[in-house]
Structure formats: C-alpha cells, structure tokens
C-alpha cells in the first residue's frame, strides 16, 4: 500500500505514508525546499489506539450491563464510544498490516491486499462519520432536555433514539462506500468538509444557546435568593470555559484532518500543501486522541456510569 500521491486515495493514500519514522526533522519537498515534518512513531500511534480501544470498550460494556443506563442519552454515548472504538481499531489494523507487509511477515496477493485496504478504508471513513454524527446527536439530545424538559421523555424515547442510531450507521456506511469508490472526485472531499463544518456549526449553536439558558436560569436563582452578582459572573465564566474547551477540542482534533482533505482539492501540487500532506499521520493521531478524550467528556462524568465501571473492573467479568 505505497503512497501514490495525496490525491490518489481518500483515506488510503494519505494514511499510507511510509511507516518508518525518525525524530522531528525537516523533509524536502519536490523542489528540495525544507518542509517541517512531524513523524509519529508507530509504537506511539498503536499505543494511543490501544488506550482508546480499552477505554471505549469499557464504556460500551458498562452501558450495556446497566439497565439504568438504557436511555436515549446513553444510547448515543454508547454509540459514540463504539464508533470511536472502530476509528482507533481500524487505524491500528491498517498500521499493523502495513508493518507486517513491509517486514515480509504477511505475504499475499496484491488483489487481496487491495481488497483489505478498501475494506479498512470504508470502515475507517464510516466510523469517523458516525463519530461526528453522534457528537451532534448528543448535542441535540442535551438541547431538547434543557429547552423541552417537560416533554423530553416523550420526545426522546428509546425506540426513537434506536431508529436514529440505525439511520446514522446505515447512512455512514453507504456514504463511506460511495466516498471510497469515487475518491478521485473533488466533490467527495468537499462534501466531507461541508459535513464537518455543519457538525461544528450545529454543536456551536446548540451549546451556546444552552449556555445562554443556563446563565439566564442562574440569574433567576440569584434574584430569588438575593445573592451577590459575582456568583453569577463566576458561573458564566465557568460555563464559557467549559464550552470553549468542548468546542476547542473538537475543532483541534478534527479540523486539521478535514483541512488536509480540502487542500487536496484546491492545491494538490502546491509546495506548502505538499508539506502539510507529509504530516497527515499527525492529523490522524489527533483524531485518535479525540477518541480518548470523548469518554472523559461525555461518559465518565456520569456518576452512575463511573459506579458501573468500578463494578465491571472489580468483578473482572463482563
């Protein structure tokens, strides 16, 4: 699975950069001018993937075992963990296959390798799309729980959540198959970028609106109990900080990846863009880091889920 150019494959060619890495250094571009390249050691990449794998397996197992967690909110959190698990697992699998092929340990026909390569690409792409969709679904679920609190349980029923989950998975797999099949069309990469921006805007609008409602609610409590204004100010700052961290992590971890795909469309031959393409594995590593952070933000803050995790780990059985 050698690198054939940044525009050759949606995820395949960009992800199949040479796996042998060295310390931080400068790589030459096509004219010999220096490019800053940040090599990611395979050991580090696989270790991060393993941490993500274990972490998200624990989340899925804890939610599956506890009936108290069988609600629409935890359904979306469980599916986010499952999609993050597949993101890290598929990237680990591809890296392992590349290493085995380069070492000569895995010897098979080129057609089999290509078929495996395409399958992993579809799995990686679909799990990434699912991860983004479930981040958006969690934001929508929380928005409804705040603005339609009295009707929340009638709106966000478990069957409806399950139908939404099924629709997301089916749409992601079908879209990924089309994206990988027609990887050489610029519209494919542009669609992915538009999808990322849509999710970013959706999350930003919903969470900002939720923050505004929370501040309004806090202000009402202050007036009711005649507390001092600094308490309200402190709440607003904490809420703004939480929102900044949540959206900042999302943009930092996913933004470079989709920016790289956009540059493949607009400047595939430009020297600066080619320097950016050389760091594609860094962008994938950021996504793996996001799959590690997601459970900390969305799952482990739940006291009930933490208690269930302690039971799962304490008993040593699923």
UniProtKB/Swiss-Prot annotation:
Residue ranges in the Cytoplasmic topological domain are: 64-72, 141-163, 212-240, 301-318
Positions glycosylated per UniProt: 29
Q: Which residues lie on this side of the membrane: Extracellular?
A: 1-37, 94-118, 184-191, 267-279
Keyword annotations for this protein, in alphabetical order, are: Cell membrane, G-protein coupled receptor, Glycoprotein, Membrane, Receptor, Transducer, Transmembrane, Transmembrane helix
Localisation:
Cell membrane
Report the main location listed first in the record.
Answer: membrane
Q: What do the Gene Ontology cellular component annotations say?
A: plasma membrane
Q: Where are the transmembrane segments?
A: 38-63, 73-93, 119-140, 164-183, 192-211, 241-266, 280-300
Q: Which GO terms describe its molecular function?
A: melanocyte-stimulating hormone receptor activity
Q: Name one GO biological process term.
A: adenylate cyclase-activating G protein-coupled receptor signaling pathway
Q: What InterPro entries has UniProt attached to this entry?
A: GPCR_Rhodpsn, GPCR_Rhodpsn_7TM, Melcrt_ACTH_rcpt, MSH_rcpt
> What is this protein for, i.e. what is its function?
Receptor for MSH (alpha, beta and gamma) and ACTH. The activity of this receptor is mediated by G proteins which activate adenylate cyclase. Mediates melanogenesis, the production of eumelanin (black/brown) and phaeomelanin (red/yellow), via regulation of cAMP signaling in melanocytes.
- What protein family does this chain belong to? Belongs to the G-protein coupled receptor 1 family.
Subunit arrangement? Answer: Interacts with MGRN1, but does not undergo MGRN1-mediated ubiquitination; this interaction competes with GNAS-binding and thus inhibits agonist-induced cAMP production. Interacts with OPN3; the interaction results in a decrease in MC1R-mediated cAMP signaling and ultimately a decrease in melanin production in melanocytes.
Record-given protein name? Melanocyte-stimulating hormone receptor
Q: Which organism is it from?
A: Leontopithecus chrysopygus
């Amino acid at each position: 699975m050698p690198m054939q150019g940044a525009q050759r494959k949606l995820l395949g060619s960009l992800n199949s950069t040479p796996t042998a890495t060295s310390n931080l250094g400068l790589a030459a571009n096509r004219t010999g001018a220096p490019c800053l390249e940040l090599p990611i050691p395979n050991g580090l990449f696989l270790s991060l993937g393993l941490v993500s794998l274990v972490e998200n397996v624990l989340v899925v197992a804890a939610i599956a075992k506890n009936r108290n967690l069988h609600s629409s909110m935890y359904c979306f959190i469980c599916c986010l963990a499952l999609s993050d698990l597949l993101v890290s697992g598929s990237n680990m699998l591809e890296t392992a296959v590349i290493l085995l092929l380069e070492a000569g340990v895995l010897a098979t026909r080129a057609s089999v390798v290509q078929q495996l390569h395409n399958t992993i690409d579809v799995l990686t792409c679909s799990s990434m799309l699912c991860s983004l969709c479930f981040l958006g679904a969690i934001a929508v679920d929380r928005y409804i729980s705040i603005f339609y609190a009295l009707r929340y349980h009638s709106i966000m029923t478990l069957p409806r959540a399950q139908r939404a989950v099924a629709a997301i998975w089916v749409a992601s797999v079908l879209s990924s198959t089309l994206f990988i099949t027609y990887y050489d069309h610029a519209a494919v990469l542009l669609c992915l970028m538009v999808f990322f921006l849509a999710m970013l805007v959706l999350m930003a609008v919903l969470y900002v609106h939720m923050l505004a409602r929370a501040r309004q609610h806090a202000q009402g409590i202050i007036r009711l109990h005649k507390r001092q204004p600094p308490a309200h100010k402190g709440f607003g700052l904490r809420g703004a900080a939480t929102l900044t961290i949540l959206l900042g992590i999302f943009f930092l971890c996913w933004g470079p990846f989709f920016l790289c795909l956009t540059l493949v469309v607009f400047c595939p031959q430009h020297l600066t863009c080619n320097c950016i393409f050389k760091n594609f594995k860094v962008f994938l590593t950021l996504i793996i880091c996001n799959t590690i952070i997601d459970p900390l933000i969305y799952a482990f803050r739940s006291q009930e889920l933490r208690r269930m995790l302690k039971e799962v780990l304490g008993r040593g059985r699923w």
